[in-house]
Amino acid sequence: GFDYIGNDGQQKSVPRLFNESVFNISVKEFFKIKEKLADYLHGGNEEDIFDYIPPQRTNQIFTPRRVVTMMVDLLEEQAPEIFKNKETTFIDLYAKSGLYLTEIAKRLFVGLKEAIPNEDERIRWILKRQLYGCAPSNIIYNMVKNYVYAGFPEVDDSNLLELDLTEAAKEGQVKQVLAERFGKEMKFDVIIGNPPYQLNVGNTSGNSSKAKAIYHLFVSEAMKLKPYYLCMITPSRWMTRSTEGIPESWIDEILNDNRIKVIHDFPNSNDCFPGVEIKGGVNYFLWEKHYEGKCAYYLHQDANKLVQSNVGYLNSSNSGIVIRDVNSLSIIEKIRKVESDYISKNSFSNLVSPKD
C-alpha cells in the first residue's frame, strides 16, 4: 500500500492488495499446481489461484468463479451470437484474476469450432484478436498473464496491459489512455468485469466513513467506449441513493437509461462474495447499446434463492430510486394514483432506503 496527495490536496491511501506473507505462501502453492490449472479450455476444472488466497482486507474485491460464470451466462443467454462471431472483442477494464477472460475464452473456443476447426489456430485467434484486459498492478498483471497465457507460450500476450485505470476514470480519460497504450483507438464490443468500488480518503486508518465510491466512474467510462454490451457487478446502494461520492445526476441518468436490460440484485453481499460485507448488497447488470425498454429485475435472497422478479422501468412511478421490494410496487402505484404529490424523490427514498 501507499499514500499520495490527490489533486484536491488531500492525503489519500491505497491499501495493500494482499497480506504479503499469506500471498507468498499462496503463490508457492499455485505454482505447485500450475500445470494442472493451465488448461482451462478442456475438462471441468473448477479451481484457480484465488481458491488458495484467503479474503484480504482491501477494497479490491475478487470475483468468485461462480459469480463470473453467472455473469457470462447472462451474456450468452441474451446475446448467444457474440460467442460464435470471431470478430467480437471483449475487455475486462480491471482484471484481478483473469477469470472473466478465461471464461469468455472457453465460450469462444466452443462457439468458433466451425469457423476455426483447428484448435491451436482457434485459441491463438481468440487470445490475440478477441480478448483484452487491464491489470491494476504488477503482481496482478503477472498472475493474470500466467493464468490466461501460460498454457499457450506461442501466443502473444500484448493484449493484456499492466494498467490501473482508476486515475483515468476519475479524469474521464479511459478511452484516451487505452488508445495511447494500445497504439490506436480501440473498439470493444463487450465490456465485462468487477471494477474497484471505493477509494479511501484521509489517513491510513481505513475509516469507512471517508470512503468515496468510484465504481460509477468505471461504469460511465465503459459506456463512453460505446460497446454493444456492458456487464458489471457493483454495489447496489446507488439504487436507493444511499452511497457517498456518487452524484445525484449520475443516479438520475442510470435510472432513466432504458438500455439496462437485466439486473440481478443481492441485498446480502455474502451471497456473491462470501465473508465480504458490502452495505446495501451488490448487483450485476446487462446494459445493451441498441436496447430501449423495460428492465428484467431479479431479487435474490436467502443464499441465492430467487424470491422476486419484475419487468418494468427502473424509475418506477418516478420515485427516483429502484424499488427493490417488488411486492411494494403495486401498493406504491395505488398511492401514486390517489395522491400523486405524496411520493417525491427525496421523501420516498428516505422512506424505503435499506437499513445499514
Label each PLM-derived region with a short phrase.
Residues 58, 269-356:
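C-terminal substrate-recognition regions of SAM-dependent nucleic acid methyltransferases
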Residues 1-262, 268-272, 281, 288-294:
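SAM-dependent methyltransferase catalytic region
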